[in-house]
Amino acid sequence: MLELLKKIGYTLYRIWFYILVALPILVFFPFLLLTTFSEKWYPAFFWLARNLWAKPILYGMGCPPKIVYEEKMERGKSYMLVANHTSMLDIMLMLYISKNPFVFVGKKELVKIPLFGFFYKRVCIMVDREDTKSRTAVYRRAQRRLNQGLSICIFPEGGVPDDESVVLDHFKDGAFKMAIAHDIPVVPMTFIDNKKRFSFTFFSGSPGPLRAKVHSFFDTTDLDGEGTAELREKVRAVILAELLAEQ
């Protein structure tokens, strides 16, 4: 009986999440749509997404963010934001942490998500990891967005591991190659509680604080392509050490 009640609770918690995701999009649809007509209006879209979508979801789920900053981002400067990826709340938490407008680079498959996918396609940089031409196009689009003063966000694991016992999967090169090519600092972040609060396993999750740590930045101005692997592993080591310390 107790197990059945738990499953009912988990199911209701999931349904509540999707209501919180959909409701602001429906209510503010005309304003969100208007800000996607031109790339120069993206900062307005970002403000709406951050303040009227991400924040209500996090607090509505009973997951108030608790952020520790070793270093803070400067207004008007571009960065490469990277973090571990274990939960659908990762997107909302990333939006909460950064006041600087940034653009997500993510899988094209997310376009299929109803309502969310409509805006994802219009404002994010989509990549087909199986298509070399797609990866090349990502660099061109990222360059254009960086020239507009925006930052870029990539989850360098390239997806969420099927095995939830994996603490942190291996990182792919893309985010670090891009940071080096464009001479922008890498901002490592550790999302400590997201997997516990709302993992991709259906019958799981619970309200509670979402702790995250923004680590000291990695400068890339003196690096070239040969430094990609070393930078990648240094950033991964910082995030992994924090995750292991909090287990």
Where are each of the predicted segments found?
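Non-catalytic C-terminal accessory region of glycerolipid acyltransferases
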Residues: 4-8, 137-247
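A generic structural signal for well-ordered alpha-helical segments
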Residues: 57-58, 120, 145, 179
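A short beta-turn/loop motif at secondary-structure boundaries
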Residues: 71-75, 204-205
